[in-house]
């Protein structure tokens, strides 16, 4: 009997070349010299790690190579699996979706017995089985004489960090503005075309009966629609329930799964995962090093900084996500610590008024519920300003599309290449240097020939930035008021009496209570 550990990394994550993700850290922490039990490990780079920058960009955006990655992980398991082996699956981001898809592959088709088979034979059989995965009603006819293990392998543990949609484009219904409607329509069209050319909607990301234990670390604070999380539906309707915990951590997507250079915050989610794993043998001092490196007050990066501002803006709706997945909202105790310390003025925007606090060791804080008559008002204010910021994003998108359309027209109707040295100024020279040739005609007209245009554009852009900053401050102000309600509750204080709990959780409800905190309610604000 041996342990087989399969690891799949996130988009753009390449172990040893990019800052370490939690998946790569765990892969490196496995003791491959262990003989009791024997352990073997497979690591798969994330999509979007090719050497060619254009292929890398397309793969990162559209998930090219995902199907091959799923086959590679399945093939490795098929080649090395013996009955009674323990299988462990780990992934981050799209790699988390990949690992979950591999488990769905096993559930749909079983596991091919690849022992003693040549590379080509096994690859061909896995490709054939993938077709069965896509069309399960025809399983027996398509599999033919491929030898399948009598029973699917039991998955001892599946651990994932912030699973996001692997292929296609997450759709949101609260679209603001013409630009966003056009973008939504375009992405829906591209998604349908991509599914027709490279079918992907057949992948099964659900929990299956062969899984013994499952853990999912999720990001509280990411604001990108493209990184919308795939939360497990915990209502599996199976006679044998899965031991599953899905826990929310402070920070953006890569603050939870790793990949930023300053990794203190992501190490908190890494440590939580390590302390939930049973049966694996790690290298000496792995747990101690993880404890030393974890920093709940570490830096939270801005996931929409720079050109990333063009990611569709949509903070995560924690309550709705958990309700749809038939699970309660579980927040890691490190979030409460960060709130209590007010680190970098941290205040999550869409925490529900009732949630469960959970720690690494199964210890809970026995606290009375805390009442807030102002919670609904503060929450309403946050949602109103979030809606306004979505509208601002729509304006930005429409203005950008307008510039691109005008540039396309001017560039396509130009009689010849522009002699930028004939008539120019310092501003134009800088713009010529930093922008593609595609924009030369537009720059000449708006900066050199009629500079009033660049002056007007500068004023409009400055106003946009100012309004955006005001909206951000307003959203943050309401979030800070919600934070004040939380940190005034006994649950947020480390010296409050604690007690053990079988599931390591305790409920915090801000809707009922013994004595409400005194907090000034803000007046209703209009946009």
Named regions from a protein language model:
Residues 1-527:
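Active-site- or binding-pocket-proximal scaffold segments within functional domains
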């Amino acid at each position: 009997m041996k342990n087989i550990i399969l690891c799949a990394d996130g988009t753009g994550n390449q172990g040893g070349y990019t800052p370490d993700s939690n998946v790569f850290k765990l892969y490196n922490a496995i003791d491959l010299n262990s003989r009791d039990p024997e352990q073997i490990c497979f690591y798969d780079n994330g999509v979007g790690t090719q050497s060619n920058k254009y292929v890398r960009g397309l793969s990162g955006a559209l998930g090219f190579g995902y199907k091959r990655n799923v086959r590679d992980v399945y093939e490795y398991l098929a080649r090395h699996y013996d009955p009674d082996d323990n299988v462990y699956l780990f992934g981050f981001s799209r790699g988390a979706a990949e690992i979950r898809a591999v488990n769905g592959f096993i559930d749909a088709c079983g596991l091919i017995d690849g022992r003693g088979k040549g590379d080509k034979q096994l690859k061909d059989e896995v490709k054939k089985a993938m077709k069965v995965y896509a069309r399960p009603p025809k399983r027996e006819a398509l599999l033919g004489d491929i030898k399948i293990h009598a029973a699917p392998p039991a998955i001892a543990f599946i651990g994932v960090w912030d699973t996001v949609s692997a292929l296609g484009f997450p759709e949101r219904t609260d679209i603001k503005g013409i630009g966003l409607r056009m973008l939504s329509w375009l992405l829906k069209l591209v998604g349908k075309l991509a599914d027709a050319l490279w079918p992907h909607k057949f992948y099964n990301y659900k929990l299956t009966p062969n899984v013994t234990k499952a853990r999912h670390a999720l990001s509280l604070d990411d604001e990108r629609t493209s990184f919308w999380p795939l939360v497990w539906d915990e209502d599996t309707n199976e006679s044998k329930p899965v031991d599953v915990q899905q826990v929310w951590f402070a920070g953006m997507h890569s603050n939870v799964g790793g990949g930023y250079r300053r990794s203190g915050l992501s190490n908190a989610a890494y440590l939580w995962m390590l302390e939930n794993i049973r049966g694996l043998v790690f290298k000496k001092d792995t747990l101690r090093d993880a404890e030393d490196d974890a920093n709940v007050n570490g830096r939270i990066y801005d996931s929409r900084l720079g050109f990333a501002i063009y990611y569709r803006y949509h903070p995560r709706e924690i309550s709705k996500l958990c309700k749809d997945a038939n699970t309660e909202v579980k927040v890691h105790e490190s979030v409460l610590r960060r709130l209590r310390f007010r680190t970098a003025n941290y205040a999550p925007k869409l925490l529900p008024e009732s949630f469960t606090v959970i720690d690494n060791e199964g210890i809970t804080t026995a606290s009375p519920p805390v009442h807030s008559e102002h919670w609904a008002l503060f929450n309403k204010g946050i949602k109103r300003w979030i809606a306004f910021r979505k509208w601002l994003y729509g304006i930005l998108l429409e203005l950008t599309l307008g510039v691109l359309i005008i540039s396309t027209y001017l560039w396509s109707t130009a009689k010849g290449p522009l002699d930028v040295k004939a008539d120019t100024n310092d501003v134009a020279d800088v713009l010529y240097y930093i922008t593609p040739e595609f924009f030369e005609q537009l720059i000449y007209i708006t900066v050199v020939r009629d500079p009033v245009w660049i002056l007007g554009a500068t004023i409009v852009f400055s106003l946009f930035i100012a309004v955006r900053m005001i909206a951000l401050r307003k959203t943050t102000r309401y979030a800070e008021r919600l934070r004040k309600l939380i940190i005034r509750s006994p649950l947020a204080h480390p010296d409050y009496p604690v007690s053990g709990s079988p599931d390591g959780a305790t409920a915090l409800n801000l809707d009922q209570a013994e004595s409400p905190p005194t907090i000034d309610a803000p007046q209703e604000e209009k946009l």
